[in-house]
Amino acid sequence: MAHFPQTPGFSGTLRPLRIEGDILDIEIEGEVPPQLNGTFHRVHPDAQFPPRFEDDQFFNGDGMVSLFRFHDGKIDFRQRYAQTDKWKVERKAGKSLFGAYRNPLTDDASVQGMIRGTANTNVMVHAGKLYAMKEDSPCLIMDPLTLETEGYTNFDGKLQSQTFCAHPKIDPVTGNLCAFAYGAKGLMTLDMAYIEISPTGKLLKEIPFQNPYYCMMHDFGVTEDYAVFAVMPLLSSWDRLEQRLPFFGFDTTLPCYLGILPRNGDARDLRWFKTGNCFVGHVMNAFNDGTKVHIDMPVSRNNSFPFFDVHGAPFDPVAGQGFLTRWTVDMASNGDSFEKTERLFDRPDEFPRIDERYATRAYRHGWMLILDTEKPYEAPGGAFYALTNTLGHIDLATGKSSSWWAGPRCAIQEPCFIPRSPDAPEGDGYVIALVDDHVANYSDLAIFDAQHVDQGPIARAKLPVRIRQGLHGNWADASRLAVAA
C-alpha cells in the first residue's frame, strides 16, 4: 500500500499526482489565437512510488511530461512518464529502489551502478525529437507527439560526457543546440564540457575543461561567440553523501566565478572572472558586443534554497531573493574582475524567459515570475517558501515593466513565449503559463498578449485536474515537428 511522507515536498500543493492520460479539445475560456500551431511541452517531478526515505525531496521525483498540442484554435492534452532506466526497473519491482537525491550510496544493491536520472527538469524539441533532461544524467529521447520513450542517447556513440545539462540553448542563426555537461567524467569530478548538436541531431563539438570547484551548474549562457558559465558555491562531496547530508550545501565563504569560453576555441582559451559570494538563478539571456560579454540572470545575496547551507545557518528568505542582474566582463582585459554589475529589475523574480529567436543576441523583451510577498495568499496550509504569484514583463530598452497577479489562491508556473508569426518583431506574440488554483485544485493554461500581461489572460485552457508544480518547458512550432509527424 502506497504511503507518501507528510512532508512539505509530498503534501498539500506538492502532493504527488502520478496521472497519465489524454484529453482531446480541452475546455477553453476565451479564444485561442487560431494561428498558433505547435506544441508546448513541460515537465515536473512526480515520484511513481513513495520514496525509500521519508526525508526525500521534491527534486528527486520521476519526470512527468505534459504536452499541450495547439491547432485550429483548439488545445489537446497528453501526459506521460519519461520512462528512464530508473522508472522501468522500479515499475517492475513495484517500489522505489533508488535512494536519496543524487546519493548512489543509498540505493538498493540491485540497482547499484545504473543511471539514476529522472528526466524531470526540462524538455525541448530538437531534430524532430523531444529531449528530456536532468543535469546529472544523459539526455533521454522521447517522441514529441506520442510521448513514447526511446531511451538515453550518446549521439551515435560520439559524446564522451556522462551527463547532459537541462538548459541547452538553440542558436537561432545556426540552429545548433548548445549544451554543457558537469561531472562529465563521473559524480564529484571537476570535468566539464561545452557541447554543440547540429539541427539534425549530430554531435558537432565537445570541448572539455575543468571547473574551479564541483558545484551545481544548473544553467548557462550562450552568445554569438562565447559560452558563459556562472559558478556559485552550491557544493557537494563524497563526505556529504557518506553522512547522508543533503547533496548540495551552500558555502558563503567562497567566491563566485564567470567562465568565458570561445565557442570555436578550446580549454586553453577559457578565462575565469571572479566576484564575491552570491547565488545565481536561471539565465534570461547572454550576448556579446565585441569582446564585452553580458549575462542576465537573477542574483541574490545569499542561498535561495531553504534546505542547502553548508554552515547550518538558518534560511534567510530576504537575502535569498534574486533580482534580475547583468554581469559584464571584457575578454580584452588583463584582469579577472567584472567590468560592471547592473540590476535590471527591482522586484524579486525567477524563471526568466525571452523571445527565443533572440537567444545569444542583444535583446529587448523579457518575462519572468515575480515573488510578490505583499500580496495575500489564502489557500489552506499557507504558501510554500517561494510562491510565484505574479507574471512580469520588462522592456529593457525603456526600463518599463508590467505585471499580472494571479490572485490570493493561485501560483504561476514558468512562462513561455510564442511569436505571433515567424517574422513578427521581437516580443510580438503570446506568453503561456500554467496557473494553479490551490483551492479548487485545478490548473489552467493561461494565454497572455506578451506585451500586455497586465491585462490578464486572453484565454484559458481549463484542465479538470491539477498539474503538479513543474520546472521547465518550451514551445515548438509545427514546422519543427515535421520530422516526427
Swiss-Prot record:
This protein's UniProt keywords: Dioxygenase, Iron, Lignin degradation, Metal-binding, Oxidoreductase
InterPro entries on file: Carotenoid_Oase
Keyword field contains Iron: yes
Binding site for Fe cation: 167, 218, 282, 472
Gene Ontology BP terms: carotene catabolic process; lignin catabolic process
UniProt GO MF annotations: carotenoid dioxygenase activity; iron ion binding; lignostilbene alpha beta-dioxygenase activity
Catalytic activity: 1,2-bis(4-hydroxy-3-methoxyphenyl)ethylene + O2 = 2 vanillin
Family: Belongs to the carotenoid oxygenase family.
Protein name: Lignostilbene-alpha,beta-dioxygenase isozyme I
Organism listed in the record: Sphingomonas paucimobilis
